[in-house]
């Protein structure tokens, strides 16, 4: 069996890396994951080389006699209402400092430690290929050095775009400098992979390379065939995961729901909206402002397995997309989890023509709402169906199309590229 060294910090790697690695042996590849943080699950089916490193942000907070577990702005006394404003003085000052100190990212101190471990591995064993996955982008810098030193083919996997990222935190000067680093680093990769066709096209424009591929995120196939839960008796709408203030807009959804309840199109005794994730102050303010405290509840964080159960028992799932035309190529990971639950999805936000809208059409799994009026229209239709049938029907969801997005298929696509690179190297 051929061996692939996967360089990815599992604290940031989302389910993509551990989920894909799990299936590599079925396609003739043994994965060895080099990471700075341990995987969440203890029963991983692949080998892990753990290389702990000092956290640069924590170190700086300690030097400044600050609590390493709390944000800079909170400890500086910046009001909550100002913390998410990108152009506030405190935000710009902190961002400037971060941009200088944490270049190219907060994992910069991992590089030396990881290189030592990777070189030792290559001395002991025959490594046939390398995959690096970002963020953090430090993983690509490590992979580049190992690939060059040991003449090993290398795939650079970008779960988020590097300097083309729609959520890029730093200013024009830092972006200019970092884009030169991106071009210099990735031009030596044998292949570049990202998570959507639109992002692959963006990378092709920047890098002018023809070795760029798209492999979407997905879900563990076991989720698709998990035991189905009884649906809630109420018209339940469920959201799982964090809410990113300034990116996810809950205001239009709550306003639309409030309008329907006030006009008695929806009976408030029938409906419950459940948010499972970190407590969000702005969301709570919106709930109270719309007089929905008896309907909408924040339950806080729950274990991952419990969130899957809550998804499967819900009449309807809420997916918040970003109202930003620059994110048309972004698939929210939550969307794939929702698909595996086989429950209807209500997507709010977005500007249309994006990958999520196409995904909903392809799988017949959900309704896409661009604005408040569309949310009102879709919710009233779904509620009417619930009242007539006692549940929201999911029989039109295309399981075969959904199954195309499982992580076993993603692993197969990675190994096809790996085998091709090995063949080209002779």
Per-region residue spans from a language model:
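Nucleotide-sugar-dependent
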Residues: 11-12, 248-251, 305-310, 317-336, ...
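Membrane-proximal helix-turn-helix segments that form the acceptor-binding/catalytic region
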Residues: 20, 101, 138-141, 145-149, ...
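N-terminal subdomain of nucleotide-sugar transferases
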Residues: 1-65, 191, 212, 416-419, ...
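Conserved donor-binding/catalytic core segment of Leloir-type glycosyltransferases
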Residues: 230-248, 254, 410
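Carbohydrate-associated surface elements
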Residues: 198, 215-218
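A conserved catalytic-core segment of Leloir-type glycosyltransferases
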Residues: 35-112
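Acidic anion/phosphate-binding donor-loop and adjacent secondary structure
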Residues: 58-60, 219-234
């Amino acid at each position: 069996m051929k061996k692939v060294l996967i360089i990815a910090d599992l604290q940031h790697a989302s389910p993509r890396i551990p989920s894909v690695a799990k299936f590599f042996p079925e396609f003739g590849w043994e994965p060895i994951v080099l990471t700075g943080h341990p995987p969440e699950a203890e029963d991983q089916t692949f080998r892990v080389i753990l290389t702990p490193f000092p956290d640069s942000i924590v170190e700086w907070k300690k030097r400044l006699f600050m609590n390493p577990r709390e944000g800079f702005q909170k400890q500086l006394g910046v009001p909550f209402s100002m913390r998410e404003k990108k152009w506030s003085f405190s935000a710009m000052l902190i961002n400037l400092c971060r941009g200088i100190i944490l270049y190219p990212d907060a994992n910069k101190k991992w590089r030396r430690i990881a290189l030592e471990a990777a070189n030792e591995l290559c001395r002991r064993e025959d490594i046939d290929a390398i995959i690096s996955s970002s963020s953090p982008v430090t993983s690509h810098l490590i992979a580049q050095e190992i690939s060059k030193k040991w003449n090993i083919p290398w795939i650079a996997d970008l779960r988020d775009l590097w300097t083309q990222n729609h959520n890029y935190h730093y200013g024009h000067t830092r972006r200019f400098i970092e884009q030169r680093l991106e071009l210099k680093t990735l031009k030596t990769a044998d292949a570049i992979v990202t998570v959507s066709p639109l992002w692959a096209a963006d990378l092709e424009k920047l890098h002018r390379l023809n070795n760029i591929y798209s492999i979407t995120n997905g879900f563990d196939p076991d989720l698709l065939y998990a035991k189905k839960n009884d649906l809630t008796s109420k018209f339940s709408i469920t959201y799982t995961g964090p809410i990113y203030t300034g990116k996810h807009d809950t205001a239009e959804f709550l306003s639309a729901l409030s309008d329907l309840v006030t006009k008695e199109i929806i009976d408030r005794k029938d409906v419950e909206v459940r948010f499972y994730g970190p407590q969000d102050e702005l969301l709570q303010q919106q709930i109270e402002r719309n007089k929905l405290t008896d309907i909408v509840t924040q339950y806080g964080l729950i274990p991952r397995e419990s969130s899957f159960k809550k998804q499967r028992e819900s009449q309807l799932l809420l997916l918040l997309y970003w109202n930003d035309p620059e994110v048309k190529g972004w698939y929210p990971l939550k969307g794939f989890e929702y698909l595996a639950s086989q429950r209807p999805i209500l997507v709010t936000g977005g500007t249309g023509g994006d990958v999520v809208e196409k995904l909903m059409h392809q799988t017949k799994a959900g309704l896409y709402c661009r604005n408040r009026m569309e949310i009102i229209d879709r919710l009233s239709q779904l509620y009417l169906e619930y009242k007539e049938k006692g549940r929201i029907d999911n029989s039109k969801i295309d399981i075969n199309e959904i199954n195309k997005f499982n992580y076993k298929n993603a692993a197969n696509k990675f190994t096809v590229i790996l085998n091709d690179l090995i063949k080209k190297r002779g």
